[in-house]
């Protein structure tokens, strides 16, 4: 009986270690394309470091992720990019400067018409 218990404990530990290894997979980076009225916005999302990069006002911005009640929010306290589902907006100094952004399936595709996938 003692030998059976020892084998079970070893197998159980091995199973836990294998499952723990599965959670170490790093999320991939993504390039997201938005249509914001007549303006296109491209956002590079670095999931490993929880930040996004985008070009606004002729400047390359890198915004770290910050706490949000809902959606994903990135801010450097001057610029803010906030997305939820397939929609997003951009603020500068707490004023919305780009609104009504809809995620595109690819840069050349039509807008996802209000669908949350």
Swiss-Prot record:
A lipid is attached at residue 22 (S-diacylglycerol cysteine). The keyword Transport does not apply. This is Membrane-bound lysozyme inhibitor of C-type lysozyme. It is a lipid-anchor. It holds the Pfam family MliC. Specifically inhibits C-type lysozymes. PROSITE patterns: PROKAR_LIPOPROTEIN. Its main location: membrane. It comes from Yersinia enterocolitica serotype O:8 / biotype 1B (strain NCTC 13174 / 8081). The record marks 70, 84 as: Directly involved in lysozyme active site inhibition. It is found in: Cell outer membrane. Belongs to the MliC family. Type 1 subfamily. One of its GO terms (cellular component) is cell outer membrane. Gene3D superfamilies: 2.40.128.200. Residues 1-21 form the signal peptide. It comes from the Bacteria. Transmembrane segments: none annotated. Disulfide bonds join 36-101.
